[in-house]
């Protein structure tokens, strides 16, 4: 089935322009500004010796994450959740997703009793904020691990691989990769896929928004996501090599 060309002129299997800028902040152990087209997320990693109380004495480390959106990151200003006095369900969900995704490639024993906290703040949202956050957070995490190593806090290699994420969806019957907001809001099927650099799936979140999808469409979406995550993995490694 044919569909109207994408507004930004991309092919259906093409990522938006991706930029990964390291060392964005002076004080964080690792920091990255990641850009998926017009979506921009600042990912900062703080590293500290010690672990949460329930983890003490285990010899195991911990990695966790928090996600938030700046009030002016969308076209309509939203109040800060800290001012509201409670964290919304969507924010909790995405924070936990980022944490799970990063922990999938962590060797807790090699990390030792150290904690790495990732803070992912959306500066501008144009679809795919959670997948951009995961992709950028991995690079910040890798830099934080090197920071801990430079201070003598660890000697092993806690990273067992890399992790990246991308959105896919069906628009007018056609599977597409890396949806901006204008596509996301009218997608018949919307999916977020998290994968390791070795090609294994960490998480697949898929929802039929307008019409149910069949197995062939699911397979097509996963194939697109595999391609997208492989491209993102390459960009992550290029960023870390600079």
UniProtKB/Swiss-Prot annotation:
Reactions catalysed: tRNA(n+1) + phosphate = tRNA(n) + a ribonucleoside 5'-diphosphate
Keyword terms: Nucleotidyltransferase, RNA-binding, rRNA processing, Transferase, tRNA processing, tRNA-binding
Binding site for phosphate: 90, 128-130
A biological-process GO annotation: rRNA processing
Single GO molecular function: tRNA nucleotidyltransferase activity
Pfam families, alphabetized: RNase_PH (PF01138), RNase_PH_C (PF03725)
Keyword rRNA processing on entry: yes
SUPFAM superfamilies xref list: Ribonuclease PH domain 2-like, Ribosomal protein S5 domain 2-like
InterPro entries per UniProt: ExoRNase_PH_dom1, ExoRNase_PH_dom2, ExoRNase_PH_dom2_sf, PNPase/RNase_PH_dom_sf, Ribosomal_Su5_D2-typ_SF, RNase_PH, RNase_PH_bac-type, RNase_PH_CS
EC number: 2.7.7.56
NCBIfam families: RNasePH (TIGR01966)
Alphabetical list of HAMAP family matching this protein: RNase_PH
Function (record text): Phosphorolytic 3'-5' exoribonuclease that plays an important role in tRNA 3'-end maturation. Removes nucleotide residues following the 3'-CCA terminus of tRNAs; can also add nucleotides to the ends of RNA molecules by using nucleoside diphosphates as substrates, but this may not be physiologically important. Probably plays a role in initiation of 16S rRNA degradation (leading to ribosome degradation) during starvation.
Oligomer and partners: Homohexameric ring arranged as a trimer of dimers.
Family: Belongs to the RNase PH family.
Protein name: Ribonuclease PH
Native source species: Nocardioides sp. (strain ATCC BAA-499 / JS614)
Lineage: Bacteria, Bacillati, Actinomycetota, Actinomycetes, Propionibacteriales
Gene name as annotated: rph
């Amino acid at each position: 089935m044919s569909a109207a060309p994408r507004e930004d002129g991309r092919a259906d299997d093409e990522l938006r322009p991706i930029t990964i800028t390291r060392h964005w902040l002076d004080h964080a152990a690792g920091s990255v500004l990641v850009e998926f087209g017009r979506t921009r997320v600042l990912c900062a990693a703080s590293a500290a010796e010690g672990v949460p109380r329930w983890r003490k004495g285990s010899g195991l480390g911990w990695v966790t994450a928090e996600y938030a959106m700046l009030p002016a990151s969308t076209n309509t200003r939203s109040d800060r959740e800290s001012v509201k006095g409670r964290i919304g369900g969507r924010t909790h969900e995405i924070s936990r997703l980022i944490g799970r995704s990063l922990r999938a490639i962590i060797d807790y024993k090699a990390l030792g009793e150290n904690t790495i906290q990732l803070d992912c703040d959306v500066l501008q949202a144009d679809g795919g904020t959670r997948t951009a956050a995961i992709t950028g957070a991995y690079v910040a995490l890798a830099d934080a691990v090197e920071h801990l190593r430079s201070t003598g806090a660890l000697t092993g290699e806690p990273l067992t691989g890399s992790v990246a994420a991308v959105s896919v969806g069906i628009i007018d019957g056609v599977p597409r990769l890396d949806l901006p907001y204008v596509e996301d809001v009218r997608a018949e099927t919307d999916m977020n896929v998290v994968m390791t650099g070795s090609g294994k799936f960490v998480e697949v979140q898929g929802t039929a928004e307008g019409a149910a999808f069949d197995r062939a469409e699911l397979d097509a979406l996963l194939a697109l996501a595999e391609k997208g995550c492989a491209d993102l993995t390459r960009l992550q490694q290029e960023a870390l090599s600079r």
